[in-house]
Each structure stands twice: as C-alpha cells, then as structure tokens.
C-alpha cells in the first residue's frame, strides 16, 4: 500500500485486537524508530478502520495474519494522532501547518439507562467514542486557538439529527445527505466552508502569511 513520493500521505487509526494496542496504518514508510510499517491492501486498511466492535467483525490481513478493528475506542477523533505524526516524522516536524480540517459525526444521543447488556456495552462505546469532546479540548489548546485565529483550523459537525442514526444504519445515507446540506447551508457555515476551501487550495500561502 506504499505510494511513490509526491502522492498524498494518508494514515488510519486502528486497534490490534489480540493485544488491544492502538496503532496506525500508513500509505508511506515511517522513518521513526518506534513506528511499525504494516503491509496491507487499501481494502484491508479501510475495512480495519471501519470495523467498530459490536457492529463488525475484526479484519485479518491476508498477507501477515494480523487482526484489527477500528481505533474508535481510543481515537475516534484522530486529530491529536495526526498532529503527533507530523511532529515526530523526519522531514515533517519543522514544517508549518497550512490547514487542519476536522469532520465530526454529530453529537451523541443521551440514552436512558437499560438493563440489556448489549445496550450497556454499546452505550460505553458511544461514550468513549465521542469525537466532539476531543474537538473541544483541541480547540481550547494553545495550538488549536492559534490555528483557528489564523484560519488554519476548521471543524464541521452536524449539531442535530445525526444522533438518532445508528452506526449500522447504512440505508440512511439520503437522510445524512439532507442533514449535511441543511447544516452547510447556514450562512455562518457557508462562510467558514469558503474559507476552508481557500485554505485547502493553497495551504502553503497560509504558512507564508503566518510564519
């Protein structure tokens, strides 16, 4: 899954199921001495990062036999992992950040207490995978405040409606699309979306403006 130089570098957060170890799958070779570079197909990587416990089976890589599930129990919002990757990789750590785009999945629903073990377990997963909590903490950090002030950090997350859709309701894509269209149609979000697009088109210009 390794790409040639010049292509977009991508990383996915996953968990190694047998030892419950959070890790990262990359389409590039990490030069950091503590990082392990795994070999897998794009399909295997995508399936692994989407294999949420209680909803999907873990994914076994055909070539190596390693078993994986998603990184959501620990890192459903991977912004800290992404920035940590930038900070530790040789050749990247001294570069300025041009733009950070964070896409949320909406606010979580406050469920009533139930005696069903499955419901309790799913409730625990929902609590620990709340990506908005991570977003709020990052936005209030020194780096988050600086990136937001200089129009280099953007967070989009639908505030209402998504919490009523379950993780395995894949047939509800039209409803998700309608909620997203309504959310992005608000004037304030439209302005932020335009600014985000501008930053993504020329992140290097952001770095020059905010050295």
Predicted segments with their positions:
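Conserved catalytic cores and adjacent C-terminal regulatory segments
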Residues: 1-211
């Amino acid at each position: 899954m390794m790409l040639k130089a010049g292509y977009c570098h991508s990383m996915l957060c996953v968990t190694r199921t047998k030892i419950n170890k959070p890790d990262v799958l990359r389409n590039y070779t990490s030069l950091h001495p503590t990082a392990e570079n795994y070999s897998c197909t794009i399909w295997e990587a995508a399936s692994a990062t989407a294999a949420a416990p209680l909803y999907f089976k873990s994914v076994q890589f055909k070539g190596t036999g390693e078993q994986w599930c998603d990184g959501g129990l620990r890192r459903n919002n991977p912004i800290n992992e992404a920035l940590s990757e930038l900070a530790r990789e040789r050749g990247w750590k001294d570069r300025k950040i041009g733009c950070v785009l964070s896409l949320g999945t909406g606010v979580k629903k406050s469920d009533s207490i139930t005696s069903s073990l499955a419901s309790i377990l799913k409730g625990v997963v929902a609590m620990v995978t709340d990506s908005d909590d991570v977003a709020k903490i990052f936005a209030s950090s020194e780096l988050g405040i600086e990136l937001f002030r200089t129009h280099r950090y953007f967070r989009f997350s639908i505030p209402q409606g998504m919490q009523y859709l379950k993780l395995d309701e894949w047939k509800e894509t039209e409803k998700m699309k309608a909620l997203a269209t309504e959310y992005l149609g608000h004037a304030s979000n439209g302005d932020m979306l335009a600014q985000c697009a501008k930053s993504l088109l020329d992140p290097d210009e952001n770095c020059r403006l905010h050295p």
